[in-house]
Amino acid sequence: MASLALRGSSENPAPTKDTTTNPRGIPYAPFVDRVEDYVTSTTDVESTLKSFSEMISKYQFMESNTQRRSAGLKDKIPEIQKTLAMVRFLAGREEDDEPLETHFELNDTLYAKALVPTTKEVYLWLGANVMLAYPVDEAEELLVGKLGAAKTSLENCDEDLDFLREQITTLEVATARVYNWDVGQRRKEREGKGGKS
């Protein structure tokens, strides 16, 4: 894929060695300005079209994975924000000696009443069935870091999705140009043979 991505046009100059990929390593699709740069005869058309089709499939696979990752982050960010808000609430109650009365969810429609004493540590689920105790201030610091990383990752996913859609469109246009060039060449060949008879 990278060998085809090194070509360019006056509108889209050939990427330099440093810009053949986006910041996360996804390669640029080749921009076909002149079909003759890719295809020299009608015998090359099939292999070129197959190559473009394979690249489109790869970009679509990357797009699908990025969409899944983005959806996961969109679910995860509100959970982190909710947990962070609770940790900050508990941090604000450190000086209060009275226990907090609360209701917590046992099931979708079943809640239990509890008295939560003032605490200096919280337990956080880290994933993969791992829970660790943290002092409240360290838990807040950890959650702020995780929230920032998740938001950055979501922004990167959104950028990558836009980039991938652009590359898929570029390849679809390239495929159409090569196909149309082939049709034109075959028509010229038929007209040339028909004129000689």
Curated annotation (Swiss-Prot):
Induction comment from the UniProt entry of this chain: Expression is positively regulated by the cluster-specific transcription factor TSF1. Expression is induced by the presence of the cluster-specific polyketide synthase PKS1. Expression is up-regulated in the presence of large amounts of glucose, during nitrogen starvation or at alkaline pH, conditions highly conducive to elsinochrome accumulation.
Gene3D superfamilies to which the protein is assigned, alphabetical: 1.10.287.370
BP GO annotations: microtubule-based process; protein folding; tubulin complex assembly
Chaperone keyword on record: yes
GO cellular component, one term: prefoldin complex
GO molecular function: tubulin binding
One Pfam family matching this protein: Prefoldin
Domain of life: Eukaryota
Stretches for region Disordered: 1-26
Positions with biased composition (Polar residues): 9-23
Coiled-coil residue spans: none
Alphabetically ordered keywords of this record: Chaperone
UniProt entry tagged with the keyword Amino-acid biosynthesis: no
Subunit structure: Heterohexamer of two PFD-alpha type and four PFD-beta type subunits.
Family classification: Belongs to the prefoldin subunit alpha family.
Role this protein plays: Prefoldin subunit; part of the gene cluster that mediates the biosynthesis of elsinochromes, pigments consisting of at least four interconvertible tautomers (A, B, C and D) that have a core phenolic quinone to which various side chains are attached and which play an important role in fungal pathogenesis. The non-reducing polyketide synthase PKS1 was proposed to iteratively catalyze decarboxylation between acetyl-CoA and malonyl-CoA subunits for polyketide chain elongation.
UniProt protein name: Prefoldin subunit 3
Organism field: Elsinoe fawcettii
